[in-house]
Amino acid sequence: MPSYIVVGGQWGDEGKGSIIAYLAIHDKPEVIARGGVGTNAGHSVFINGKKYAVRQLPTGFMNENARLLVGAGVLVDPEVFFHELEHLKDFNVRGRIGLDYRCTVIEPGHKELDRSNGYLHGKIGTTGSGCGPANADRALRKAKQVKDLKELEPYLTDVAQEVNEALDEGKLVLVEGTQGFGLSLYYGSYPYVTSKDTSASAIASDVGIGPTRVDDVIVVFKSFPTRVGAGPFPTEMSEEEAERMGLVEYGTVTGRRRRVGWFDFEFARYSARINGATMLAVTMLDKYDKEAFGVTDFNKLPQKAKDFIAEIEEKVGVPVALIKTGPELEHIIDLRENI
């Protein structure tokens, strides 16, 4: 598995961060590269009971031997970047991070426009992080790049070059996606989408990896999908039902309450197909079956949980390789050896 990509299969907030964190520690990749849109998506991980949330830097930061990279396709907010360098100082991130010199900069004006635009903020439900306006300026070829900012000079690199050289040397490369397939500008429920494609193909392009150099694609699904902001959500349940089932969540970036729904097998199959999934990861199985909490051996899962995993594999047509049964890093079942 010289290179693999982890992407969300629903509308974001699938728990990609917890899967990426596990892979970063367990598999020990030498390079961890982040693709995706920008600072409009947050990944949360729990390490020794402490919660860390990142919006700009790779979620695999806790692997202190890995080179951390942010691909050319990612938007960079200097304010968020430097905040996270300080936030993660215990992990020596500052000495390991590289930004592709071609990344577009999110400027204060982009954030102001994002938050003040009635259409984006009201109808679409933007996070207000400035990503949409920044990508618009990029498409118009008038945006700044990180190479234009002196304060970012120490961190500049050619991410595509680094990643491909690492692959040439047989190193393990982990690529992180952000948000989810259902928010893709191309394949999501337009116009209630993000400002670019979020599929595995796009994430590979973000960091400069050609399609023939991707060995595995892990698509992450949450047992009860969630969505922040407006847009179609066919299996959505009522807020009252979500409260009764203990499924109330709030967005990492926006703080807004997430809409909750039942697992949509048809959408999951479509998502896995377009992303080219070779493996699936299922998170928050303990929310589906509370007796599954903390279980690390598949054979010890309660039957209800086993049946749910079997149904996903049958209806989606892709094997489930990783199962999260709780918030901590060690709350996971790894079935990759059986695939």
Curated annotation (Swiss-Prot):
A single BP term in Gene Ontology: IMP metabolic process
Lineage of producing organism: Archaea, Methanobacteriati, Methanobacteriota, Thermococci, Thermococcales
Annotated residues for binding of GTP: 12-18, 42-44, 258, 284-286, 324-326
Coiled-coil segments: none
Domain of life: Archaea
Pfam families assigned to the protein according to its UniProt record, in alphabetical order: Adenylsucc_synt
Membrane-spanning intervals of the chain: none
Subcellular localization: Cytoplasm
Cellular component GO terms held in the UniProt record: cytoplasm
Cofactor(s) needed for function: Mg(2+)
Root EC class: ligase
Family: Belongs to the adenylosuccinate synthetase family.
Binding site for Mg(2+): 13, 42
UniProt keyword terms in alphabetical order: Cytoplasm, GTP-binding, Ligase, Magnesium, Metal-binding, Nucleotide-binding, Purine biosynthesis
Protein's name according to its UniProt entry: Adenylosuccinate synthetase
Residues binding IMP, per UniProt: 13-16, 40-43, 127, 141, 179, 194, 256
Stated role: Plays an important role in the de novo pathway of purine nucleotide biosynthesis. Catalyzes the first committed step in the biosynthesis of AMP from IMP.
Binding site for substrate: 252-258
Active-site residues, as the UniProt record annotates them: 13, 43
Reactions it catalyzes: IMP + L-aspartate + GTP = N(6)-(1,2-dicarboxyethyl)-AMP + GDP + phosphate + 2 H(+)
Quaternary structure (record): Homodimer.
Pathway in which the depicted protein is active: Purine metabolism; AMP biosynthesis via de novo pathway; AMP from IMP: step 1/2
